[in-house]
């Protein structure tokens, strides 16, 4: 059985832009998303650079209470998914939630949860 996948909307939260428009403009202008690590103290580490998401405020992109309960990487995913739904012209109040989906990739998940138990 052949199955078709249809991409109808896009969303982005990246080191070079927190929306699709910002991301695309960053690509076109050659914006560099790599810089000094700011999310934690790097004194005891050799690596000092990373591609961190900057200037992201989750409570501006989703329900404040929901954002407060989520790890930051989950907030990125929800914000990008909401942008993709809006880009597709979907009103989630009107759509059948069983007919709408999104694919989200995360290479490692929540470092704030992994790091404290890794030593």
Give the ranges of each region predicted by the language model.
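Conserved "HGTGT" condensation-loop signature of ketosynthase/thiolase-family condensing enzymes
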Residues: 1-119
């Amino acid at each position: 059985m052949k199955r078709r996948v249809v991409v109808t909307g896009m969303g982005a939260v990246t080191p070079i832009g927190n929306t699709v428009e910002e991301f695309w403009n960053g690509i076109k202008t050659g914006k560099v998303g790599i810089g000094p690590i700011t999310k934690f103290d790097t004194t005891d580490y050799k690596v000092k650079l990373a591609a961190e998401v900057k200037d992201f405020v989750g409570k501006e992109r989703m329900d404040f209470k929901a954002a407060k309960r989520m790890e930051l990487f989950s907030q990125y995913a929800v914000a990008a998914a909401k942008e993709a739904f809006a880009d597709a012209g979907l009103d989630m109040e009107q759509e059948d939630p069983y007919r709408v989906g999104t694919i989200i990739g995360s290479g490692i998940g929540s470092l704030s949860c992994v790091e404290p138990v890794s030593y």
